[in-house]
Amino acid sequence: MRGRAGETTMTAALQELAAHIEMKRPDCVISTEIAHDELTVVATPNSIVGLVAFLKTDATCKFSTLIDITAVDYPERAQRFDVVYHFLSMYQNHRIRIRVPVREDDIVPSIISEHPSANWFEREVFDMFGILFSGHPDLRRILTDYGFRGYPLRKDFPTTGYTEVRYDEEKKRVVYEPVNLVQEYRQFDFMSPWEGAEYILPGDEKTDDKAEAKG
């Protein structure tokens, strides 16, 4: 574990990096934030390719490794989604997170021209959230089936799904059918003091024995 001095050094380095990025690319950056020794840059959708190219080639940054692309759904916001990019600079030993707020009907430029590995990441974001990427050479589902309905990681997607898949012995093939619950769907509230399950943990019996002895 790093001590307070190490955390201060890391925070100072990230503050310098954030200031450098804001100074060099003010047209791309909406805001920056440092929390838990991590730098997050909020950027505009139209500038994402240029910003990623800058982060990759700039001598101070050198974020040459794309770790991941994902998204977060905020149904209550006008800009419903955050497309989130994670990059690593092995040269500077830094990580950076780029957040791009987008509306449900916005189209985000693909960064495949800068990071070919973004191909499958962007396909996964499209498959799970329905976010479109312009300039992608093969934007189709990657995890769900061809005729899958909806986007599973959106907050309004039903936990039961819309269809169920099973093998039909008579037809000798896989068939799709509407979801047919054997019993009514129930929402369990395990945090409720009234409906919560009673878990007996190791050592609880000793407490009960002491209570009986006092009684």
From Swiss-Prot:
Recorded coiled-coil stretches: none
KW Metal-binding (keyword) present: no
Cited PROSITE patterns: COMPLEX1_30K
A Gene Ontology molecular function term of the record: NADH:ubiquinone reductase (non-electrogenic) activity
EC numbers: 7.1.1.-
SUPFAM superfamilies, per the entry: Nqo5-like
One GO CC annotation: plasma membrane
Domain of life: Bacteria
Catalytic activity: a quinone + NADH + 5 H(+)(in) = a quinol + NAD(+) + 4 H(+)(out)
The entry's keywords: Cell inner membrane, Cell membrane, Membrane, NAD, Quinone, Translocase, Transport, Ubiquinone
Top EC group: translocase
Bilayer disposition of the protein: Peripheral membrane protein
Function of the molecule: NDH-1 shuttles electrons from NADH, via FMN and iron-sulfur (Fe-S) centers, to quinones in the respiratory chain. The immediate electron acceptor for the enzyme in this species is believed to be ubiquinone. Couples the redox reaction to proton translocation (for every two electrons transferred, four hydrogen ions are translocated across the cytoplasmic membrane), and thus conserves the redox energy in a proton gradient.
Assembly description: NDH-1 is composed of 14 different subunits. Subunits NuoB, C, D, E, F, and G constitute the peripheral sector of the complex.
Protein name according to UniProt: NADH-quinone oxidoreductase subunit C
Organism of derivation: Dinoroseobacter shibae (strain DSM 16493 / NCIMB 14021 / DFL 12)
Gene name linked to the record: nuoC
